């Protein structure tokens, strides 16, 4: 492991973010899928359209139980001779069990990858990637492994231990730091993730998957589709994921409860998905909340008042 090479980067709220960082993503992992039936098998399991996914594209998706509750949220892309599903490590053993449940009937091999995952962030990261790849696509194969675009300021590199020495020798321009900076970019882009504390609790729309092209409403049947479709066409979904800011004494964790104001009282309002705490206590968090709250609703976490921050996208699914 390369963890000692990636120290903590201490940032305050008003600090400018580094324009090029590289981090080892120890809290993330890949499920890989190979075999003759991989496409048809995965198509019948997940919310996104696997069949139409081009070789050089990446998409968000979710894997649900029969009632439409999410086991995982992932980003899917082609890798080596199959597919890779990039997702949170804490929930990956549960997800592996669930995604393999019907695999015995198909020619497909599903496993957790032991590849090294590196996160490239910042405006200059793409410049470096452009210099070391022969493509301008969102998924690129290079001598170091597979690069996949996670957001406008985040790229994932799936690599192997034998490549790290040469790779590190070429990263003198980058700030090497721990993966908290990756989390900060992820939160600023309001990208959902699913840790084990949130497994099997929410439907995809509660984490905004429809807003980031993570649900296909035109594909054929998949597990949980009936609930997901009802949420769209009958309006049964009552939750969404929002971006909040406030002051915290300690880093909030996935699954933490956040309160909301009801008149002069407080009651449980929602659940933290992810959070980043700056050194000065200012904190950004993604939280699942009711989607019909009044504009003047206040929020409370760790005895501090929090407020909504505008999302970088709309919650429509068109």
Curated annotation (Swiss-Prot):
Residue positions annotated to bind folate are 28, 182
Q: Which SUPFAM superfamilies match?
A: Aminomethyltransferase beta-barrel domain, Folate-binding domain
Predominant subcellular localization, coarse grouping: cytoplasm
Q: Where in the cell is it found?
A: Cytoplasm
Which one Pfam family would you cite for this protein?
A: YgfZ_barrel
Any one biological process term the GO annotation gives: RNA modification
* InterPro entries xrefs: GcvT/YgfZ_C (IPR029043), tRNA-modifying_YgfZ (IPR023758), YgfZ/GcvT (IPR045179), YgfZ/GcvT_CS (IPR017703), YgfZ_barrel (IPR048451)
Q: Which residues form the signal peptide?
A: none
- Family stated for the protein in its record: Belongs to the tRNA-modifying YgfZ family.
Q: What does this protein do?
A: Folate-binding protein involved in regulating the level of ATP-DnaA and in the modification of some tRNAs. It is probably a key factor in regulatory networks that act via tRNA modification, such as initiation of chromosomal replication.
UniProt protein name: tRNA-modifying protein YgfZ
